[in-house]
């Protein structure tokens, strides 16, 4: 599915992490794919309220939880900078799809990082 939201389609997700050699590109690519799948799901299912959005972001957050082992295997981790950038990406997505009242912490409440 192609992302139709222009703001999202043009956004460089996780760019500051790609610019830091500490974070392996191949794992970041998987994280970026998680974010894009979330966007595709939002466009396909069109959540009607914050509760529905939070259910969607919970699944995407759990996918990031699973990536932690891959970061560690590559000598990296989801540390403070990465946590902030990933959280910001979730918040950006919520805003881009019209959820101005989304709580940044609630968007990633299922995080283990």
Model-derived features: positions:
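Charged, amphipathic alpha-helical oligomerization/scaffolding segments
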Residues: 30-37, 56-59, 63-66, 85, ...
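Mature extracytoplasmic domains of secretory-pathway proteins
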Residues: 42-68
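Hydrophobic, Leu/Ile/Phe/Ala-enriched alpha-helical segments that form helix-helix packing faces
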Residues: 38, 42-45, 64, 71, ...
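Alpha-solenoid helical-repeat scaffolds
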Residues: 25-32, 47-50, 54-57, 80
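Short terminal alpha-helical segments
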Residues: 1-44
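Amphipathic alpha-helical binding modules
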Residues: 72-113
């Amino acid at each position: 599915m192609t992302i139709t939201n222009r703001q999202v389609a043009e956004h460089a997700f996780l760019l500051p992490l790609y610019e830091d050699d500490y974070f392996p590109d191949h794992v970041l690519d998987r994280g970026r794919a998680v974010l894009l799948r979330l966007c595709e799901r939002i466009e396909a299912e069109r959540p009607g309220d914050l509760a529905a959005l939070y259910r969607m972001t919970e699944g995407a957050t759990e996918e990031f939880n699973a990536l932690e082992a891959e970061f560690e295997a590559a000598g990296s981790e989801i540390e403070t900078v990465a946590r902030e950038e990933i959280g910001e990406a979730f918040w950006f997505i919520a805003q881009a799809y019209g959820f101005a009242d989304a709580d940044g912490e609630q968007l990633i409440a299922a995080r283990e990082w």
